[in-house]
Amino acid sequence: MTPFDPAPGLIAPDFEQLSLHLPARCLFAFLSEARIERFAREKGGTPLGRFASITKSFPIYELQTPDGPIALMQAPVGAPAAVLMEERLYAYGAEKILAIGCCGALTDLPENAFLPVMKAFREEGTSFHYQEAGDWILFDEAPRLRIEAWMKEKGIPCSHAVTWTSDGFFRETKEKIKARRRAGCNVVDMEAAALAACARFRGKEFAQILFTADTLSSLSHDQRGWGYHGRNAALEIGLAAARVM
């Protein structure tokens, strides 16, 4: 592995020089485009613009709340793609991002449990471009505590996620799962460590809520309902939680 280099990159996240000014807070959702579009329409959201990539274009909406405007955008799956869009959100005005999406359970967690992330085990590659090498990245405590307090106030069951961020969806082996559980991980995802590392590098505030979908707790795979009910609730919970960031 090459040493971490904190020098500026030669390509800036705002290289396109878009006429786009985002609200300070953003909800970054690992959910389908159709679900996000429907939610934005139901909330009276306003289209702000789009971020283009080689494979697709990502619409950005502005939702009005009693605590001010919040941007809403679909997050692409996988650490490199997710951070590519996170960087652009920061470049065009976002100061605080709340990511929300599903995860796999490694321990005996029920399906559709919503878990604010406390820390992530770094077994992807993207975070190492943004922080010195190390096994873990701790998430910002202040926004997590505000989100947890809000969840408790609303009666939403709340416990921490200690997540294993992996690039290898089909390489979650029995021995790796055992090792990650011994280290304290209770869920697995594909982006959290990288998103937190990017936010810290850019000096921005970041939090993430994961909801449980499938499970590997028995050292075999049970897809359960793939977090279907969690997906239905995620945008409402995410928007409300973003208001307290």
Write out the residue ranges for each language-model feature.
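Metabolite-binding pocket within alpha/beta catalytic cores that recognizes anionic/polar moieties
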Residues: 1-146
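Flexible, glycine/charged-enriched surface loops at secondary-structure junctions
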Residues: 47-52, 156-161, 245
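Short acidic/polar active-site loop segments enriched in Thr and Asp
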Residues: 95-96, 186, 205
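Active-site rim beta-loop-alpha module in soluble metabolic enzymes
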Residues: 134-182
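Generic non-transmembrane alpha-helical segments
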Residues: 146-154, 198, 237-245
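Zn-dependent metallopeptidase/amidohydrolase metal-coordination segment
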Residues: 193-227
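His/Asp/Glu-rich mid-to-C-terminal helical/loop segments that flank catalytic regions of hydrolases
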Residues: 216-245
